[in-house]
């Protein structure tokens, strides 16, 4: 076990990193904290690419379809690491409609392989959903197929399911990580931290908000010195909390919230308040789920954020 370390190392210009399917730069942030100099990123979404550029001002960002991008565009000097998480919706266990190889997103791992094969970084980190471990194309397991492809182009490969809450993130989200290197190093995944960051440690310094409230700029409710180490890390470049937006739910929905304790869900709501549900017993366990303040959050999916309830306030998450 080990303690969380939120300190940022000075980037080493010799350790060049590339982030594919970069989003706003979550993997890149971890890489820079470890001393890697993020030089390039590829992200097709305009808004995500703009966020990445703002977060990593020294990086060159290619905002385009990776399938149309030549790896030579990024291959200007020796690269230490390529990282990325190809689109995962098609592999997700929650996807019951297009969870097969006919989903074009399920072939995007081929693009990651193409860039690694062409650029030949010393290391790569491939991240995806747990569901990929159970996914088959015919009789072949896709995870095994991907790992063997990396081995075929000269990499020593190891993989493991990691939980974000074991490494300083206040959310119990699991992901498959496949890590490889060209030096034959028998890589070991890092040990879990000796504690988990709770929901309260993560958000208790944020403004108190009402149902449907929009507060583009507010004030922290806890002084910096009294905030948790995690909150201090989140606030180190911020003087005020911004873009605090709460989904507006109807009054009868807010009334339901009042009956739900921390860790409880729809099952705590009286039947007379659930009249619009044809069969309440068929509700998913995550519907009307109030988070437990003293523990990491359950997995948060943005498309259903209003179904997760603030641990101390009768509203959805902001």
Task: List the model feature ranges, each with a label.
Residues 62, 75, 170-172, 291-294:
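Extracellular/periplasmic catalytic domains that process cell-envelope and extracellular macromolecules
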Residues 2-120, 130-143:
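Core alpha/beta nucleotide-donor-binding catalytic domains of modification enzymes
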Residues 28, 89-93, 132-135, 168-171, ...:
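Short catalytic/ligand-binding loop motif for oxyanion handling, primarily in non-cytosolic enzymes
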Residues 229-318:
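C-terminal target-recognition/interaction regions appended to catalytic cores
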Residues 107-181:
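Conserved Class I SAM-dependent methyltransferase catalytic core
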Residues 66, 161-165, 283-286:
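Short alpha-helical segments and helix-capping/turn motifs at coil-helix boundaries
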Residues 162, 203, 300-301:
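Bulky hydrophobic/aromatic "packing anchor" residues in well-ordered structure
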Residues 168-224:
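Flexible, glycine-/basic-rich loop-and-beta segments that form/coincide
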């Amino acid at each position: 076990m080990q303690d969380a370390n939120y300190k940022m190392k000075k980037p080493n210009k010799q350790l060049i990193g590339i982030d594919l399917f970069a989003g706003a730069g979550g993997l890149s942030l971890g890489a820079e904290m470890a001393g890697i100099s993020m030089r390039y990123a590829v992200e097709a979404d305009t808004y995500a690419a703009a966020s990445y550029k703002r977060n990593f001002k020294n990086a060159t960002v290619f905002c385009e379809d990776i399938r149309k991008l030549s790896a030579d565009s990024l291959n200007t000097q020796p690269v230490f690491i390529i990282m990325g998480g190809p689109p995962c919706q098609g592999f997700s266990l929650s996807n019951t409609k297009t969870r097969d190889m006919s989903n074009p997103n399920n072939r995007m791992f081929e693009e990651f392989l193409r860039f690694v094969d062409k650029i030949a970084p010393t290391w790569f980190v491939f991240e995806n959903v747990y569901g990929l471990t159970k996914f088959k194309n015919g009789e072949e397991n896709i995870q095994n197929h991907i790992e063997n492809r990396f081995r075929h182009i000269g990499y020593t490969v190891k993989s493991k399911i990691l939980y974000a809450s074991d490494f300083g993130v206040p959310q119990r989200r699991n992901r498959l990580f496949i890590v490889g290197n060209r030096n034959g190093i028998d890589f070991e995944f890092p040990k879990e931290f000796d504690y988990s960051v709770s929901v309260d440690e993560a958000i208790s310094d944020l403004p108190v908000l009402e149902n449907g409230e929009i507060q583009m700029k507010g004030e922290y409710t806890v002084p910096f010195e009294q905030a948790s180490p995690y909150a201090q890390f989140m606030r180190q470049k911020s003087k005020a909390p911004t873009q605090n937006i709460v989904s507006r739910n109807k009054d009868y929905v807010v009334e339901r919230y009042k009956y739900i304790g921390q860790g409880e869900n729809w099952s705590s709501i009286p039947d007379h308040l659930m009249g619009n549900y044809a069969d309440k017993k068929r509700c998913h366990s995550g519907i009307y789920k109030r988070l437990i303040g003293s523990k990491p959050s359950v997995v948060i999916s943005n498309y259903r954020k209003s179904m997760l309830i603030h641990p101390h306030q009768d509203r959805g998450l902001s």
